[in-house]
């Protein structure tokens, strides 16, 4: 028989009422906030108007790989398999007391769209738009403003000594409503830009 989990091991997901309370306190910020997007224990986010693709066919983790950004046309844009697309949420968010997780909506998953490769978790203190690492199993037409994912908020056990927005080493603190390319190169020291 398994022993009961200690309180520190139990992950608590915020309910709709707890999310609203946190928004009223200012510990969670969602802009624009639309009440109809609040689920039972999540908040729906939407695809912003921009996509980007990497300019080079082979990426280098030690370098700042250039991207080409474009606006999604009104008639939509067809994503194709084998290509990584960087998207962005239409919503700006802040999370000061909870750990935010971004997950795809089931309707999006049923179209074969993945909205993040590995980066679904945010940090306490993350204050920005969410860049999406999008890929598809089949060609699929997407549209700016379509529901793309949902934010889930977890309680944190203990005081956070270094929130993301106050860390000098945080790589994604510059607020931008545009897709942001990988900053992995900063882990290797000084930026090594492609020539």
What are these regions (language model features)?
Residues 2, 6-195:
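DUTPase catalytic domain/fold
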């Amino acid at each position: 028989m398994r022993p009961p989990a200690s309180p520190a091991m139990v992950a608590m997901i915020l309910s709709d009422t707890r999310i609203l309370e946190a928004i009223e306190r200012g510990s969670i910020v969602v802009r624009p906030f639309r009440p109809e997007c609040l689920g039972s224990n999540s908040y729906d986010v939407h695809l912003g108007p921009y996509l980007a693709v990497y300019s080079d066919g082979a990426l280098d983790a030690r370098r700042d790989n250039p991207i080409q950004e474009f606006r999604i046309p009104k008639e939509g844009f067809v994503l194709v398999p084998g290509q990584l697309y960087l998207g962005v949420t239409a919503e700006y968010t802040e999370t000061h007391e909870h750990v935010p997780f971004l997950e795809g909506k089931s309707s999006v998953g049923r179209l074969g769209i993945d909205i993040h490769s590995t980066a679904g978790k945010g940090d306490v203190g993350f204050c920005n738009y969410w860049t999406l690492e999008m890929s598809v199993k089949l060609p699929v037409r997407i549209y700016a403003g379509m529901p793309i994912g949902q934010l889930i908020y977890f309680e944190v056990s203990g005081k956070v000594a270094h929130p993301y927005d106050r860390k000098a080493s945080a790589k994604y603190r510059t607020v931008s409503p545009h897709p942001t390319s990988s900053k992995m190169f900063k882990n290797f020291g000084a930026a090594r830009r492609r020539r």
